[in-house]
């Protein structure tokens, strides 16, 4: 489905001020506290695809995770694996990548899912059938302004039931690379968006590259 400006308009008007003042006796709050004591904080959220972290780290609702590192460190690859693992748990994901087309992302996901460098035709068809209601892409290349980014996430959460959002990357926002205040505003906007919608947002952020991989990363 193409998302035109008319569809996005109501989502642009939403502000953080629209969050309701709610009673301490709100049934949703009560259920959250029950879950906290009965299940434990570490058991809430989307599992990551590593057994060693199964009971130590989750992609929790209302939170933002920043994947930082130099170019070629595998940030996008890891995020792709997290999306696949989320799908296996029944969570729907949205990938907003200004750096890779949906075709390129799907080609990589097919390799990851099949464990084959060149997946077979049947494997690709089976993956498409499996992923059709689990993984969604925002099909735009180049850059996107922060307001449109937040509007897209709100729209996807409302219309597709998205629970995990990948934004790849911070450097593809419509701003100068040294606009630190602008980058801070984007991170804050995504964190607020995650909290308001009850989704988890993964933000890929590139660090300045040193001479060696072991060099300390600049801010």
Language model segments and positions:
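Active-site proximal loops enriched in glycine and acidic residues that flank catalytic Cys/His/Asp
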Residues: 69-71, 81-82, 97-100, 139-141, ...
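Phosphate-binding/switch region of NTP-binding enzymes
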Residues: 54-56, 72, 185-219
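Short, basic, glycine/proline-bearing loop/turn elements
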Residues: 38-39, 65-69, 134-140, 176-177, ...
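Conserved inter-motif catalytic segment of the P-loop NTP-binding fold
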Residues: 6, 31, 44, 89-185
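The Walker A/P-loop phosphate-binding site
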Residues: 16-116
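Well-ordered alpha-helical segments embedded in enzymatic catalytic cores
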Residues: 52, 78-82, 148-152, 186-189
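Generic beta-sheet signal
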Residues: 63-65, 93, 163-167, 199-203
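C-terminal regions of RecA-like/P-loop NTPase motor modules
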Residues: 1-16, 21-25, 29, 150, ...
